[in-house]
Amino acid sequence: METAPKPGRGVPPKRDKPQAKRKKPRRYWEEETTPAAVATSPGPPRKKARTGESRPPRSKSAHIAQKSRFSKKPPISKTAPDWKKPQRTLSGAQDPFPGPVPAPLEEARKFCRIDKSKTLPHSKPKTQSKLEKAEAQEEEASVRAARAELLLAEEPGFLVGEDGEDTAKILQTDIVEAVDIASAAKHFDLNLRQFGPYRLNYSRTGRHLALGGRRGHVAALDWVTKKLMCEINVMEAVRDIHFLHSEALLAVAQNRWLYIYDNQGIELHCIRRCDRVTRLEFLPFHFLLATTSETGFLTYLDVSVGKIVTALNVRAGRLSVMAQNPYNAVIHLGHSNGTVSLWSPAVKEPLAKILCHRGGVRAVAVDSTGTYMATSGLDHQLKIFDLRGTFQPLSSRTLPQGAGHLAFSQRGLLVAGMGDVVNIWAGQGKASPPSLEQPYLTHRLSGHVHGLQFCPFEDVLGVGHSGGFTSMLVPGAAEPNFDGLENNPYRSRKQRQEWEVKALLEKVPAELICLNPRALAEVDVVTLEQQKKERIERLGYDPDAKAAFQPKAKQKGRSSTASLVKRKKKVMDQEHRDKVRQSLEQQQQKKKQDMAMPPGARPSALDRFVRRAREGGLQVDP
């Protein structure tokens, strides 16, 4: 039996053969065809050979990001992203304009809703941080809105005449010939002399039109496609007609009571508590139908629950002039003594009264921003008032014939119906009042005007008169872009139903209607102080008052009576010094304000005597 020789001098030791590593199979898309591809092909990072070079020592102050033991979130980098560094795209090219698109400052300010000039000096740190976060969110929202405004492709148009041409002399036939076919189809006349005169109302989307004739004719139609929705005869006089929150419900003020119809002409409700109604207005965000009557009552009907919210006795006789302020939902009523009163369902007395004319008020209209109010009276005066707290007339014009109907467009155009003539005045823009010097457009109708309204989101003016209905083209009257989530003219039936549910959930209570809606978000300081005073009287002490200083007990004879009194006096002196320093700063600020010269004033040589007299406590007139 042979044995293996032992390793010795002549026999080399036996070694194990190294096993060849199995290569990972490569796919056809991972194959390397050229040396360049091999050099640039992605693969696992190669380990660098260690060299004898030592790494530079790390400074002790260097921050090392460590993973938290309590949170699974990765550590957040405190450094802001550097937008200035060029970013590389998928194609390998560098972006020449890195970062987000800069928003124009003017557009961002237009969308900002927070006034940063008002600060809370003595607010808590938690409250201050919440305010700062809200301001940052509001600023970000305004910047995004300014960037999104670039997507609004539609722009408002306007009618511009040739050199020396008066636009008031341009006829409707000339405008129809100059515009496209789709816009020309929006101008039409309805000859309905047998049932006139007519009142009219457009829906909030601007797609549907409701007509109500004095002799009982009621009709609703899609005026864009000329498709008739319903047509009935109520067999009694119709005084006014108005759509509710959607085109599916229609309110008709008939001779005796108020009726509600659907879009098929079926009578749904007869509201007998609203009798002898003369005018109708609907508040869309509150779901309130405001009615005025011959008996002098202003009634608010909640159409969501079918109940009367309030019935106010105006004590001014017959009410036939009413308008709504779209900004704050306040109702404006015109009276026979020349005054206009402002009403809210939360108050039984008028919020304000404005003396506008020497005679009775015939018509009232308020623009879409709630800034300007136009009135016309029996004295043939047309006036525009400023509603921003002053209620002062800005401009006035004497008309050859008193205007019986007024209306504002979405972009601030003012129309007045005088007999069978319609005059339109335009201003410098939406935020400026219309100029009453020269009319923008003029049109003569086949009958006396009985109702006026601009169509939302369309450059169209609807006029109801004794001969029927006329649709006029008014360039630059409406907003070119609409909010698809609020008023969408192209919405389907399902979208309308979804919008109704959301609108009912976001319904604003009637008690919140006031002149200044922004006051709802402010702090009621008077009520807060009154509650604090009542709390102090009830408890017998002020729980929020600062506690008296109580020195801590010390050892080794430092808590003697003299030491305690000395420490208390030191704290009292410090508080007294702070109060004196604060009062001196207030006096210096007041003195600077008193000595500040008005803009445009020149310094005088006698000003030095005025300063000395004020410092000495004397009263000297400059």
Curated annotation (Swiss-Prot):
Xref: SUPFAM superfamilies: WD40 repeat-like
Location (main, coarse): nucleus
GO biological process: ribosomal small subunit biogenesis
WD repeat extents: 192-233, 234-271, 314-353, 356-395, 398-435
Ranges for region Disordered: 1-135, 547-622
PROSITE patterns: WD_REPEATS_2, WD_REPEATS_REGION
CC per GO annotation: nucleolus; small-subunit processome
Keyword annotations of the record: Nucleus, Phosphoprotein, Repeat, WD repeat
Modified-residue entries (Phosphoserine), positions: 41
Gene3D superfamilies, A to Z: YVTN repeat-like/Quinoprotein amine dehydrogenase (2.130.10.10)
Intracellular or extracellular location(s): Nucleus, Nucleolus
Feature: compositional bias, Basic and acidic residues: 106-118, 571-582
Keyword Nucleus found: yes
Disulfide bonds listed in the record: none
Superkingdom classification of source: Eukaryota
Physiological role: Scaffold component of the nucleolar structure. Required for localization of DDX21 and NCL to the granular compartment of the nucleolus. Part of the small subunit (SSU) processome, first precursor of the small eukaryotic ribosomal subunit. During the assembly of the SSU processome in the nucleolus, many ribosome biogenesis factors, an RNA chaperone and ribosomal proteins associate with the nascent pre-rRNA and work in concert to generate RNA folding, modifications, rearrangements and cleavage as well as targeted degradation of pre-ribosomal RNA by the RNA exosome.
PANTHER family in alphabetical order: WD REPEAT-CONTAINING PROTEIN 46 (PTHR14085:SF3), WD-REPEAT PROTEIN BING4 (PTHR14085)
Assembly description: Part of the small subunit (SSU) processome, composed of more than 70 proteins and the RNA chaperone small nucleolar RNA (snoRNA) U3. Interacts with DDX21, NCL, NOP2 and EBNA1BP2.
Protein's UniProt name: WD repeat-containing protein 46
